[in-house]
Curated annotation (Swiss-Prot):
Pfam families attached to this UniProt entry: Cpn60_TCP1
Protein name, per record: Chaperonin GroEL 2
Encoding gene per record: groEL2
EC identifiers of the protein: 5.6.1.7
CDD domains assigned to the protein according to its UniProt record, in alphabetical order: GroEL (cd03344)
GO MF assignments: ATP binding; ATP-dependent protein folding chaperone; isomerase activity; unfolded protein binding
Stretches the record annotates as Disordered: 525-544
Length: 544
């Protein structure tokens, strides 16, 4: 396919135009008085969102070159979302402001490479400053504040996430599900829970709630498919003599063996429940190993030279209580702290070493199941459109709280960046010169963009608000919700330091790339043909 090649100023201006469009669509959502954006969907109802990265992903322009600009600035939002999980709108607004400032300087003859060096040095200085000003998150009140701000000033959500975090600990997993009611509810599971339920409903012990509850059971864990009754009989005899219930976790249990278990259960010979092993492939093996360590048993696997028919009671695990529903199994075990701790440490090391985001997520899930537990927030709303919007806001809020716990909190509402403007200006003038100084100064000027935009979205003059904030102490900022200047920590308007830092770093990275661009190569649009589609031989040529 033929390509168009555009050089220097023309190329940068085309990129800028694409960025202007995306930045404006995203920036309207910034702050407590930010508006929503409606996204048309080819299938299903339109989606109403207030989330920067979701809007950025939807925007596709007709002009190929402008679309390249959109893709670049979208990267700043996506990368911030991947790193910190929130702050995508701030990253977009910052990147746009830096590009606008930078292009003026490049047009005036500044050297783009020297500008880039200046930008990088200024960002490094600012990252250190943000870390200096960050306060650690000590109590659930601070967590609730971070979550509430991130969810669009929803205090109820803030309280719920703080409670979930309190229950499952810092390494626990908080997951979101679409609820069935109008209200959003929190459900916390103690112990290890995995997404596999009983194989047959005949195993239930509580017919009203349709769940099987086993008190102090033995747990048989195997990675093989159980097909023959002969394999199971020795195991069942040993457990029946011990007089305790039995939970079987296996790859699958075929008809004949399953029928034997059901008959034993119905006759009252043995209280037994069978579930399929969670996960797939290597992940399944790892999860079975986790369950074995948690319950003090071992995985009966032919790879280890262990056969089911020779299994003895001392290779079974045990738990205080097991609850099995049609979709989930929850194991509450105790007494194996040392082994569990060692396993958690091993998983933590794997998390540090892996590069794949998906693997990280799955390892984090395993760690949570072993160490803390799992909290599920069931998102409720009147309509599906509202539910999707709430779900996105909650996702941001959960990510923001995790980021806050990691690196602490700083004054929110664009305040931190605005207060750092004089500091970075002073530092740059003392340490840099020439075009590097110009690069650092363009970063300094761009830092006011998020606060300016928050004020404008609240119907105020952004530049006046920015100047007023800069005159005040570091923790004092502009509360757009109530149109007042307040101490941000006291008012609970805080941002995770990690979110502010990531937004700044990713915005600067994209701005540097755009400023150092000298040519763009894009596909030439195909000429539109005026001929009707398809030659002869269509359906219309025939009489039926």
């Amino acid at each position: 396919m033929a390509k168009s090649i555009i050089f220097s100023e023309e190329a940068r201006r085309a990129l800028e135009h694409g960025m202007d469009i995306l930045a404006e669509a995203v920036a309207v959502t910034l702050g407590p008085k930010g508006r929503n954006v409606v996204l048309e969907k080819k299938f299903g109802a339109p989606q109403i969102v207030n989330d920067g990265v979701t809007i950025a992903k939807e925007i596709e322009l007709e002009d190929h070159i402008e679309n390249t600009g959109v893709s670049l600035i979208r990267q700043a939002a996506s990368k911030t979302n991947d790193t910190a999980g929130d702050g995508t709108t701030t990253a977009t607004v910052l990147a746009h402001a830096m590009v606008k400032e930078g292009l003026k300087n490049v047009a005036a003859g500044a050297n783009p490479i020297a500008l880039k060096r200046g930008i990088d040095k200024a960002v490094k200085f600012l990252v250190d400053k943000i870390a200096e000003h960050a306060r650690p998150v000590e109590d659930s009140k601070a967590i609730a504040q971070v979550a509430a701000i991130s969810a669009g000033n929803d205090e109820e959500v803030g309280r719920m996430i703080a409670e979930a975090m309190d229950k499952v600990g810092r390494e626990g997993v908080i997951s979101l599900e679409e609820g069935k009611s109008m209200t959003t509810e929190l459900e916390v599971t103690e112990g290890m829970r995995f997404d596999k339920g009983y194989i047959s409903p005949y195993f239930v012990t509580d017919t009203e709630r349709m769940e099987a509850v086993l008190e102090n059971p033995y747990i048989l864990i195997t990675d093989k498919k159980i097909t023959l009754v002969q394999d199971l009989v020795p195991v069942l005899e040993q457990v029946a003599r011990a007089g305790r219930p039995l939970l079987i976790i296996a790859e699958d249990i075929e008809k004949e063996a399953l029928a034997t278990l059901v008959v034993n259960k119905l006759r009252g010979v043995l209280s037994v429940v069978a579930v399929k092993a969670p996960g797939f492939g290597d992940r399944r093996k790892a999860m079975l190993e986790d369950i074995a360590i948690l319950t003090g048993g071992e995985v009966i696997s032919e790879e280890r030279g262990l056969k089911l028919e020779n299994a003895r009671l001392d290779s079974f695990g045990s738990a205080r209580r097991v609850t099995v529903t049609k979709d989930h199994t929850t194991i509450v075990a105790e007494g194996n702290e040392a082994a569990v701790k060692a396993r958690c440490e091993q998983i933590r090391r794997q998390i540090e070493e892996t590069d794949s985001t998906y693997d990280k997520e799955k390892l984090q899930e395993r760690l949570a199941k072993l160490s803390g537990g799992v909290a599920v927030i069931k998102v409720g709303a009147a309509t599906e459109t509202e539910m999707k919007d709430r779900k996105l806001r909650l996702e941001d809020a959960i990510n923001a709280t995790k980021a806050a716990v990691e690196e602490g909190i700083v004054p929110g509402g664009g305040t931190t960046l605005a207060h750092l403007m004089p500091a970075v200006t002073e530092w740059a003038q003392a340490n840099l010169s020439g075009d590097e100084l110009v690069g650092a100064m363009l970063v300094a000027r761009a830092l006011g963009a998020p606060l300016r935009r928050i004020a404008e979205n609240a119907g105020q003059n952004g530049s006046i608000v920015l100047e007023r904030v800069k005159e005040k102490p570091f923790t004092v900022g502009y509360d757009a919700q109530n149109d007042a200047y307040v101490d941000m920590f006291e008012a609970g308007i805080v941002d995770p330091a990690k979110v502010t830092r990531s937004a700044l770093q990713n915005a600067a990275s994209i701005a540097s790339m755009v400023l150092t661009t000298e040519a763009i190569v894009v596909d030439k649009p195909e000429p539109k043909s005026n001929k009707p589609a398809g030659g002869g031989g269509g359906v219309d040529d025939y009489d039926y």
